[in-house]
């Protein structure tokens, strides 16, 4: 799979990132390198390899489960084109 300049611009638009025309070729190369690496990973034979979540045994620290909005709701939705009550508004796609 190869990423072209139009795809770079579309990804930037969807991510709400400003990208100049001078940056597009560099980003195109970076994205193509990432995709090439992922394709290499897909070729690795993992038959018989036991799934793991970490290379070292770890115990997660437990804490009380309390509700906390983080007081950053306004910052989270600041770049969204449409919001209501700290929620993202998206176009209806299913009738």
Swiss-Prot record:
**Catalytic activities:** L-glutamyl-tRNA(Gln) + L-glutamine + ATP + H2O = L-glutaminyl-tRNA(Gln) + L-glutamate + ADP + phosphate + H(+); L-aspartyl-tRNA(Asn) + L-glutamine + ATP + H2O = L-asparaginyl-tRNA(Asn) + L-glutamate + ADP + phosphate + 2 H(+)
Pfam families membership: GatC
Which E.C. number(s) belong to this protein? 6.3.5.-
One GO biological process term: glutaminyl-tRNAGln biosynthesis via transamidation
Record's family? Belongs to the GatC family.
List the PANTHER family hit by this protein, alphabetically: GLUTAMYL-TRNA(GLN) AMIDOTRANSFERASE SUBUNIT C, MITOCHONDRIAL
Instruction: Tell me what this protein is called.
Output: Aspartyl/glutamyl-tRNA(Asn/Gln) amidotransferase subunit C
């Amino acid at each position: 799979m190869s990423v072209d300049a139009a795809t770079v611009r579309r990804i930037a638009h969807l991510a709400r990132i400003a990208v100049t025309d001078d940056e597009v070729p560099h980003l195109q190369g970076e994205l193509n390198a990432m995709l090439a690496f992922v394709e290499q990973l897909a070729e690795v034979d993992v038959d018989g390899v036991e799934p793991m979540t970490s290379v070292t045994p770890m115990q997660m620290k437990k804490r009380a489960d309390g509700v906390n909005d983080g007081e950053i709701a306004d910052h989270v939705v600041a770049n969204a084109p449409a919001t209501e009550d700290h929620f993202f508004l998206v176009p209806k796609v299913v009738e």
